[in-house]
């Protein structure tokens, strides 16, 4: 898949773009099967990100692609690696990790405004996350982005349910601006999506989403890639997701050259 120059430019300038039909119908079917397998075999990293009194559940899981052939196929053999290289303007695409996000019908728990990269153990500007639903997603429950928020400031990462600082120490990074209170100052991007569509966004782009309606299930697979300039940013705390033993194998500032993060050298569509 070759992207238009305007799509690449919008990604670089705005920090998020929509990609229509980036997965084929057969790939959507395969991914749906992979999500079902993941939900039936949650990993030790899985968590419920909604509160106990929520009528639905917000389920997350991380880093299962090496044990899930459907996920591995999507990450390696779909159009995603080649699209990632184009968006990142990188000669390489390295798998960083996968992330499952499922909001069951009636889930009230929102996904609060945040950036992804402050939770991670990686530095560099060449990166991309794909947010890929296998269910139709109406605009009101789709992911929202603050345009151009990926260009500078790192904001304080906090837990979703109770806003605790479990990563950077309090005061180490800027607090979130009043995004929803001042919409004119923080223009937003969002798109309704169909299965096969994806949104691609930079790991520093501020994003959030609402809960879902009483009859809506929102099953999403996120695929994350790193480009040429990605480097290991060793942290004195447990990152989200954690990569146990990585600090012993990779020096701080080293390229992300580890078996956990393979380069995708060839792209083949099945």
Briefly describe each language-model feature range:
Residues 121-138, 192, 224-227:
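Short, conserved beta-strand element in jelly-roll/cupin
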Residues 1-14, 20-113, 119-121, 236:
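Non-heme Fe(II)-dependent double-stranded beta-helix
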Residues 116-118, 127, 207-212:
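Glycine-rich phosphate/pyrophosphate-binding beta-alpha loops
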Residues 80, 90, 105-107, 136-139, ...:
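Short, charged/polar surface micro-motifs in flexible loops or helix N-caps
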Residues 91-93, 97-98, 109-111, 126-132, ...:
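Generic beta-strand structural signal
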Residues 139-206:
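Double-stranded beta-helix
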Residues 34, 41, 45-53, 158-160, ...:
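Non-heme Fe(II)/2-oxoglutarate
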Residues 99, 115, 132-136, 145-147:
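Short, structured patches in soluble enzyme cores that scaffold and shape functional sites
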């Amino acid at each position: 898949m070759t992207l238009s120059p305007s799509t690449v430019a919008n990604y670089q300038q705005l920090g998020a773009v929509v990609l229509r039909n980036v997965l084929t119908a057969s790939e959507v079917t395969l991914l749906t099967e992979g999500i079902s397998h993941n939900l039936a075999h949650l990993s030790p990293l899985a968590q419920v990100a909604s509160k106990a009194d929520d009528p639905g559940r917000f389920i997350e899981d991380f880093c299962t692609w090496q044990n899930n052939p459907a996920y591995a196929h999507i990450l390696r053999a779909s159009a995603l690696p080649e699209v990632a290289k184009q968006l990142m303007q990188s000669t390489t695409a390295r798998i960083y990790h996968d992330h499952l996000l499922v909001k069951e019908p009636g889930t009230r728990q929102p996904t609060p405004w945040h950036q992804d990269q402050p939770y991670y153990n990686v530095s560099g500007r060449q990166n991309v996350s794909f947010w890929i639903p296998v269910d139709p997603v109406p605009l009101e429950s789709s992911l929202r982005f603050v345009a151009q928020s990926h260009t500078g400031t790192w904001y304080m990462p906090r837990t979703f349910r109770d806003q605790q600082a479990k990563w950077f120490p309090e005061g180490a990074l800027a607090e979130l601006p009043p995004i929803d209170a001042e919409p004119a100052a923080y223009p937003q991007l969002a798109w309704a999506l169909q299965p096969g569509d994806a949104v691609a966004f930079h790991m520093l782009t501020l994003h959030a989403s609402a809960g879902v309606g009483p009859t809506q299930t929102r099953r999403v697979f996120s695929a994350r890639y790193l480009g040429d300039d990605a480097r290991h940013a060793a942290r004195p705390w447990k990152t989200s997701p954690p990569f146990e033993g990585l600090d012993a194998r990779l020096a701080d500032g080293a390229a992300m050259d580890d078996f956990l993060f393979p380069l995708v050298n060839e792209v083949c569509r099945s």
